[in-house]
Amino acid sequence: MERTWRWFGKKDKITLDMLRQIGVEGIVTALHDVPNGEVWTQEQIRDLREYIEGYGMRWSVVESLPVSEAIKYAGADRDRLIDNYKTSLRNLALEGVKNVCYNFMPVLDWARTDLLHPNANGTSNLYFSHAQFAYFDICILKRPGAETSWPDDVLAEVEKLKATMTPEDDHNLVDTIIVKTQGFVSGNIKEGDEHPVELFRDLLSLYDGITADALRENMRYFLAAIMPVCDEMDIRMCVHPDDPPFQILGLPRIVTCDADIDWFLHAVDNPHNCLTFCAGSLSAGGHNDVVALARKYASRTSFVHLRSCHIFPNGDFTEAGHLGGRANLVELVRIFEKTDPTLPMRVDHGMTMLGDEARGYNAGYSFLGRMFALGQVQGIIATVDNELGLPYRQPGLF
């Protein structure tokens, strides 16, 4: 598998010089300074591609070319935004960048309630608490009817939190759920925005009355519109599963499980309509057999995220070490190496380790934690390649 790394552009505190020393072959990035919905010009793309290539690596995957909210909820501006999207795709392909990761999650790109949850060994990681998320939903966001979305045991925990949460705790929870995890990814709400809760409510209101079936139809419309460009330019569009893979905040989630993946692959049945196989997102749902999904969909996968989650008895989940958790990364690497040993892979997220926390890295995207994980995955790949009789590459040494 091609060893890639998510890099947030020239402003990233992790430099390309650092990455080429740790075995990274390809870069996963985007034009993060271009607002959602605007065209990525060929000149902008070329500038970034050449910058990456100047460090001996290639721009392997776009993550992400964001799908504007108005495309997802079928707003009046949808067709104009899709035309812009097609122009950006064409410009990417003209510069040789032809693997594009995206998602179709409304409003929230991914959700956690704690970005620095302590581990016994002194590291920290990402954590999702149903009770804390429900507290945000009911007591901070005050979403109408929110109480009906949560089971009685979670509501009982919310009552306990009401007695202990301070205004500072509330602020930190808001910052975690709708600012720190979103600003550097979707740009919907950013650091420094005033009244983020009110802005978030406004975004949620755009999806009033949008059912899962309606969102599916909007996804079908989008894919049908862009596939002719993908066919012409040989672009693989690989959708990212919903994170977490269950409904939150009353929003429909339509890429959460086997049936959902099967649906979108057949909704527009085209070899350029592909999957980003995110083992972490899928393993956060107890309903998913991650290895079985990999076996079933490896041939329609054009990008792999390797991480793993552990689910607690109450349904909360945390990022596990890359050798632990539910995902079984050893078997996943074996499946994907057999299918296509050139498939781009990145270690997704990583523990925050001693030396990471003070550096101001984006949530979940530490340097030392991901470097440690990449070393583990390199070992898995070397072992699997030896089993399969494949030559093992040592990137950057010879």
Put a short name on every predicted segment:
Residues 12, 39-60:
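Glycine-rich, positively charged N-terminal anion/phosphate-binding segment
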Residues 109-197, 256:
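Aromatic- and acidic-residue-enriched segments that line the glycan-binding/catalytic groove
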Residues 21-22, 57-72:
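A short glycine/small-residue-enriched secondary-structure motif
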Residues 33, 66, 106-107, 244, ...:
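Conserved beta-strand edge residues that scaffold enzyme active sites
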Residues 9-32, 51-55, 91-100:
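Catalytic domains of carbohydrate-active enzymes, especially glycoside hydrolases
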Residues 30-46, 249:
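Glycine-rich, proline-tolerant flexible connector loops at the mouths of alpha/beta enzymes
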Residues 1-4, 9, 17-20, 70-74, ...:
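Histidine-acidic metal/acid-base catalytic patches
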